[in-house]
Amino acid sequence: KKCIFTTKSDRNLDFLINAWRQIYTLNKDAELYINPPYNVSQDLINLKIKLRHKGSKNNLINDLKSSKIMLVPGHKGEVFCLAAEEARELCLPIVTMGYGSLYERVEHNKTGYIARNLNEFVNYTHKLLNDKDLYLKFRSHLLSLRNTRNFSHVANELINLISQNK
């Protein structure tokens, strides 16, 4: 059960590692892959936190395709989150806190979960890792959305968002 975090470590990786301590307690067969550079201590290795091997886009695509869930809390400074969009296109459910643009990238209870607190983040991750029917429901919805976003779609979303905030 591979989980992945493919964004920068300053995008609330500390929150994720704290959450992972609880997630791993509930899911001893789960692994969390994070982006380098990051100092993975023996304590984190014992929690099955591993560094991805960065490199070509093919490496990233293969890492995403071999993962079950993307865990990405988000960050207040994030205005788009390409990592979440990549996960969406590869039909990978996301568990997030919805910080920054993540609340726009995830449809709660359809393409992933937007947690309101640490407990929900842990519980949503646990559910997706262990409930095959739920995982397949999310994946099916993501498959139906695949290749539906293009430049004009994203531009219209931005215009609508700006209009709502006037």
What is each model feature region?
Residues 1-49, 53:
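Conserved catalytic-core segment of nucleotide-activated headgroup transferases in glycan assembly
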Residues 61, 84-89, 103-104:
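Short alpha-helical segment that forms part of, or immediately flanks, the ligand-binding pocket
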Residues 65-79, 92:
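Acidic donor-binding loop of glycosyltransferase active sites
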Residues 99-109, 113-114:
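Short acidic/histidine- and often glycine-rich active-site loop of Leloir-type glycosyltransferases
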Residues 113, 117-136:
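C-terminal "capping" alpha-helix adjacent to the active site of nucleotide-linked donor transferases
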Residues 116, 133-163:
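A charged, aromatic-enriched C-terminal amphipathic alpha-helix characteristic of glycosyltransferases
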